[in-house]
Swiss-Prot record:
The gene is rplL. This is Large ribosomal subunit protein bL12. Keywords: Methylation, Ribonucleoprotein, Ribosomal protein. Forms part of the ribosomal stalk which helps the ribosome interact with GTP-bound translation factors. Is thus essential for accurate translation. It comes from the Bacteria. It comes from Nitratidesulfovibrio vulgaris (strain DSM 19637 / Miyazaki F) (Desulfovibrio vulgaris). The modification N6-methyllysine is found at residues 77, 88. Pfam families: Ribosomal_L12, Ribosomal_L12_N. InterPro entries: Ribosomal_bL12, Ribosomal_bL12_C, Ribosomal_bL12_C/ClpS-like, Ribosomal_bL12_oligo, Ribosomal_bL12_oligo_N_sf. One of its GO terms (molecular function) is structural constituent of ribosome.
Amino acid sequence: MSSITKEQVVEFIANMTVLELSEFIKELEEKFGVSAAAPAMAMVAAGPAEAAPAEEEKTEFDVILKAAGANKIGVIKVVRALTGLGLKEAKDKVDGAPSTLKEAVSKEEAEEAKKQLVEAGAEVEVK
């Protein structure tokens, strides 16, 4: 029996038609119990999965106090109620605007906090 080199096998495969190559791959899959499609599918699936987060609706939001506005005392009261901070800490947050008041909260909670702060006269951003 003559010995066949890798180069000869590669050359033989390179000269096959697409149909012959497809049948050859199927035979190899059956003989060795493997699937040539699995790695390709994983790569194809990984592409859209990476792009999907940009298209998905955001589920966690941050409430950021941009400015206290004219009613600083009212804003401090709302900040205390929303965050559970003491008077001094809440005042420091308001004085240090822009500052993040709530992080990684639901959309509903973020919108409610924004509503309360805006009613008190604050300028608020939800990210």
